[in-house]
Structures are given as C-alpha cells and as structure tokens.
Amino acid sequence: MYLMQLVFHHDIQAKQKYQCLQCAKGCQTFAVPLREGEGERIEKLRDWRKQLSVKQLFVKQSKLTGGGEVLAKDRHGRCLFLGKDNLCEIHRDFGLQAKPLACQLYPFVLSPLGGTFRVGLRYDCPATARSSGRSLGDYQGELKVMVKAFLPKDISKSEYNDIVPNIKVNEEVDLFTFDAINDTLVDIIGSDAMPLKVRLLWLHKFMCCLEKIKWGNVVDEEVGGMIDLLKGASLKETIAFADDNVDTAVTPPSGKPRKLLGQIFFLLSQSSIDGLTATGLAGIKHRFGIVRKMRQLVKLYGPLPKVQPDWPDCDLQALEVDFAPMDKDVSDVITRYLIGRIGATGYCGVNFYHYAMCDGLKTILLGVVTIGWLMRIAATKDGRQHFTVDDAIYGIMTVDGNLGYAKQIATGPALMRLNYLSDHLPNFISRYLGSC
C-alpha cells in the first residue's frame, strides 16, 4: 500500500491551534458518514438497540443530501452513542479504533492533492474556531495511523499523484502550478496590513484574472512571473475600485441578486444535521417548513425566519442597518479561518463538490458574505450595532458546518447561480463586510 505524506501548510501551523474540549459539539452537529462495513462492525460490538432503547442506529441519506449511511441522532440532534457524560460509548468501552473513521479524524480533514494529504480542520468545532490548545504538528503521529485505515489497500501511487483540482472547468494544471496559485491566495488573504474588505475584493479580482488565462499554454518557467503579474494587476484594480467607491453608500442587494443570495444564506445557515431527526409525517412537515423558511429569506423585508431556533424576533430590514467598523481582533478570526480553508485546499477538489479552484473560491467568498450577515443576526439579538469575536465565531461555526458538506448547495443549477452571483460579489463584500 502506498502511504501518502501529510502536509501542513506553514501559515496554518503558525496561526491555528487545536485541543479537544470534550464539549461533544461535533457529536451534535456532525452527520457522521459510515464507510463500507463500519455499520456492521459497530452492530457486532453489542446489542446497541436494546441498550439504547432505539430501533434505528443508522440513517440512509437521500442522494440530495449525499447518499450513504450516517449515524442516527436522537430528537435533540445528539448522536445516539453519546452518553450523558458527553463521552462516546463506543470509544469508552471499545477504544478509539472501534469508532467510525470520520469520528476518529474529526475535526481534522484530509484533502488528497498530488500524492499528499493536505491537512485541514473543520471550523464547526469550538476549539478549532477559537484556536485553543496544542500545535497542529503535535497530531502528526495520530493522523499517520488513521491514514493507513483511510486509504484502500490496493491504492497506487499514480492514482493519488494524479489528483489535482482544475483551475476552472476543463482547465487542468499540474501540481506545481496549482500550489503556486494556492500559496498566492493565502498571501493575499493574509496581507493583514490592509482591511479585510480590501483583501476579499483583491481575492475576487485575482480570481477573475485567473479565469482569463489559458494555463495550458503557460510553461513552468513562466508560472511565477504570470502569477506575480496577475497579483499586481488585480491589486491595482482593487485599490482603484475601493478609492472610487469610498464615499458611495452600498445599498442592500435587491431583485434577483437578493433572491439568489437569500438562498445561499439559507443553505449555509441551516443545521448541518437538518432532517436527520425528523421521519415519517414529521419529516414531510419538516420539508414544507424548509421551503417556507427559504421563501421568507429571499426577501429583503418581513420577519426573519427561524432557520436557527435562537435567532431573534426581528424584521429582515433590521439586519440591513449600518454597523460600526469591525475591530481587528474580529477580522483576524475571519482571516485565520480563510487561511485554514484555503491553505489546506478545503475549498475545491474531491472534498468540495469536485469544484475547480475558481468555483470553489466563489463559494468560499459567498460563505464569508454569509458569515458577515450572520454576525449581524448575532449582534441584533444582543441589541448591538458593533461586532464581537463571539459574533465572528458564531458565523464561522454555522457556515463551516455546511460549506463543502451540505450537498444541497451544489445540486441542480448550483454553478449557474454561483457564476451569476460572482459578478455581484464586490457589492456583497462591501455591504456585509464593508465595516472591516
């Protein structure tokens, strides 16, 4: 068996820490996918149905939500195997190796790329979102053990060497070019001498430049020069755009852009385990409720639907007032999140809807816009017109639980919606992250 190298991006290692808090948050928000044979193996450990007083241990998902089986949840959304002491009963009684591999890895994410695994994290985990605990390098030994179980025994080196996401649809590049561009994306978002809004606008402009180049015609010796040229040109255009609009009030989006953005807000704000706890007639009612809430959220006026049960009772228009400029410690949290996602390539390829790099960047930018909108909800709930670190963490944890995992966002005409909204991203960024 070919054992792939684990790669931690240096910028992620410098900024990100993690140590399990035993809060069991992941056991309540993570729809745990089961690999072939894992369900049967767990069933053989014990008569779980009798011990837990349940009929169903696993749930078959529809193709719309990803297919396959996941661990069942109770009516409160807790994993059935989570004890009252917030400890996993499988882990406690049978050891770590007895748990599904997805549980063992959480919150780590391994993205195959060019014969390596790029190591990232899920940010719906409180310890990850707050960057508390140990250096990520401390986990390398544990992750290497899990990688052996993660890879099929008949895997060949060439099969994984060939995994490199496209830059755009039908535009392949080699690993050298992909890494060079990806490192530039990290450099742009990490240029914290500039306001976050400007960096996000720069990232979007650079992405637009990437889409115009036929990378198959660029030889390795010219890649670095081409990237530097695009980086400089896109920064110049970004600064000109920001200067031209410095005194221009950014109005809330309306019409078709607001309708499609409202769909994104809904898809990235709903619970990542939504639907797993409702079956039969309750499941039908639940699905009608989803449609109703989405229809409410595509509007600019009217009551804020309770997509999350703790959302405040307010009008959607209350979220469109001007908020105070974002403090640096708040924007730093969002910056760290973006470096974590982009540095670990957790925004494209096999772990992200098989999206090309540019389509993944559009999705990530819409995710950040949604984080800005969710921060407004958190502040409004507390009667504030300024943002806190907790607001940013709430937005990140909510969005990241869906971004790349909720299949609904990538089904049907998803790419058409994505490409349409891409043209409006500068206005969305200026509107919902303009105070940063």
Predicted regions and their residues:
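Internal, well-ordered alpha/beta segment that forms a basic, Gly-enriched binding/recognition surface
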Residues: 94-96, 101-198
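Hydrophobic, aromatic-lined core segments that form the binding pocket/scaffold
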Residues: 186-436
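Gly/Pro-rich turn-and-neighbor structural signature
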Residues: 49-50, 54-81, 85
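Polybasic, low-complexity association/targeting segments
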Residues: 12-63
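Local cysteine-cluster metal-coordination motifs and their immediate loop/turn environment
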Residues: 16-32, 74-108, 122-130
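Short, flexible, mixed-charge glycine/proline-rich loop motifs
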Residues: 11-14, 69-74, 94-95, 117
